């Protein structure tokens, strides 16, 4: 199985294709790297392929903030330029420009 190139980058703001949430990417797995139990808990009719990048998000919806693990096939660019209101944003990123956050320079 070939390693896939990621479509999105760390710091990109994205939204879910099917569910009402958005978030900022803080890590990328170039193939599925979560537990089999987690994978099997997804309804079969919407279960994503494992052979694609999966993204770790600081996510939010209208009610709550949380962390999400989402397949590339289920993400779209969020070009609203609205900030993500997750409490961990400032621990990981140092600023925002347009529809992307950036990490501190070393």
Enumerate the predicted regions with their spans.
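Generic alpha-helix detector with strongest preference for long hydrophobic helices that associate
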Residues: 4-6, 38, 73
């Amino acid at each position: 199985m070939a390693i896939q190139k990621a479509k999105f980058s760390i710091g990109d703001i994205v939204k879910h294709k099917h569910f009402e949430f958005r978030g900022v990417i803080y890590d990328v797995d170039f193939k599925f790297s979560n537990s089999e139990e987690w994978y099997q808990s997804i309804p079969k009719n919407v279960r994503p392929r494992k052979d694609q990048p999966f993204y770790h998000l600081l996510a939010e919806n209208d009610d709550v903030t949380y962390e999400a693990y989402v397949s590339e096939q289920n993400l779209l660019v969020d070009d609203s330029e609205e900030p993500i209101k997750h409490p961990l944003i400032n621990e990981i990123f140092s600023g925002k420009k347009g529809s992307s956050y950036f990490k501190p320079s070393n």
